[in-house]
A protein has these predicted regions:
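Short, acidic/polar
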Residues: 27-41, 89-105, 124, 150-154
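Active-site mouth loops of central-metabolism enzymes
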Residues: 18-32, 82-92, 117
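Structural preference for beta-strand elements that scaffold enzyme active sites
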Residues: 4-8, 47-48, 75-81, 109-112, ...
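Beta/alpha (TIM)-barrel catalytic core signal, keyed to glycine-rich beta->alpha loops juxtaposed to Asp/Glu
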Residues: 118-314
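Active-site groove signature of glycoside hydrolases
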Residues: 104-123
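N-terminal binding-site loop/beta-alpha segment at the start of enzyme catalytic domains
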Residues: 1-76, 303, 314
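Acidic (Asp/Glu)-rich catalytic clusters
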Residues: 3, 43, 65-75, 99-106, ...
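Short beta-strand segments at enzyme active-site cores
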Residues: 48-52, 111-114, 252-254
Length: 314
């Protein structure tokens, strides 16, 4: 695997369509809007881009690929996913979806290829092996898998000399199930990179939204988070104080906390003004006392941000 930066950039909100940026995030972003973001990020050393076929049913990959094609392939790290729930019942469903991604990106390999949701570990994990052997994918990961599923996936791959190189799960101050289930410890013990998505809880942990300034109405994230924003007030107030002491932002505090947990955060950036802020977050350190305070306040919010697509991690 290529050397990974401290932070990945996520493109779930790029493009429109089913499971796309308009429906989930309330965004209506096209390539012209996002090209400056991509270029600014690459200049800043953020070259790890996370996407999935299911994001807009190919729309996110389509937009991202228009930018990656303009760069030396070795300078870009492409992370995309196979989603069993949209794959159909063909024996070669994974290879078909992988080939479609390769075609969109105009490349002959994907750096990190993920099984997006477990569905059936015994059925889908073996399908990664021919992709690894052919070189179509350089490394593989599993997303939204619990500890037992992760261990079983590793056993299946190990029989052919391969391994799960990365895990990608929802992980934030408000949702620490992967830590509670022992997945973070397992990753440390097995030299597996843990990618944390929704570190900012789709904007709810940025301090930019409140009851008076809610997330976009009619969007998936608005439906999920607007009703719980008042419960986050004490947590956000503590994060704001920590940020002010460092001349930082609340978002940076959330990202710094995730990095301190030995995770690689995936941050969705849609505006150039947030690139420098995201890069700088990797240089911020929290004391153990500060982290403990935030975790305690987060637990006291009583909110549950578990997505409908997730199952228990234990």
């Amino acid at each position: 695997m290529k050397k990974l930066p401290a932070i990945a950039l996520g493109t779930w909100s790029w493009g429109m369509g089913a499971a796309g940026g308009d429906r989930v995030f309330g965004n209506h972003l096209e390539a012209a809007d996002l090209k400056p973001v991509f270029e600014e990020a690459m200049k800043a050393g953020l070259n790890l881009w996370d996407t999935a076929t299911v994001y807009g049913m190919g729309a996110s990959e389509d937009i991202l690929s228009t930018f990656t094609k303009q760069y030396n392939r070795e300078d870009v790290i492409i992370s995309t996913k196979f989603t069993p729930q949209i794959a159909g019942m063909y024996g070669d469903s994974m290879e078909r979806m992988c080939d479609a991604s390769l075609q969109r990106f105009g490349t002959d390999y994907i750096d990190i290829y993920w099984i997006h949701n477990p569905a059936d570990v015994e059925r889908w994990t073996p399908c990664l092996i021919p992709l690894l052997k052919s070189g179509k994918v350089k490394s593989v990961g599993v997303s939204n898998h619990n500890l037992a599923e992760l261990k079983r996936a590793n056993e299946i791959l190990a029989a052919e000399g391969f391994r799960v190189s990365a895990v990608q799960n929802h992980f934030s101050l408000l949702y620490r199930s992967s830590e509670e289930a022992g997945i973070l410890d397992y990753c440390k013990e097995n030299d597996t990179t843990f990618f944390a998505y929704m570190v900012l809880e789709q904007g709810a942990l940025t301090g930019r939204y409140s009851s008076n300034n809610p997330l976009p109405e009619g969007s998936g994230r608005g439906e999920t988070y607007n009703k719980i924003l008042p419960q986050l007030d004490l947590l956000l107030a503590a994060m704001r104080l920590m940020a002010e002491r460092r001349k930082a932002t609340i978002s940076q505090i959330a990202i710094a906390w995730a990095i301190a947990k030995h995770t690689l955060p995936i941050i969705g950036v849609t505006k150039t003004k947030y690139i420098a802020e995201t890069v700088a977050a990797a240089s911020i350190s929290l004391t153990s006392e500060e982290s403990a305070l935030l975790e305690n306040l987060a637990a006291k919010t009583g909110v549950d941000t578990k997505g409908s697509w997730k199952h228990p991690m234990i």
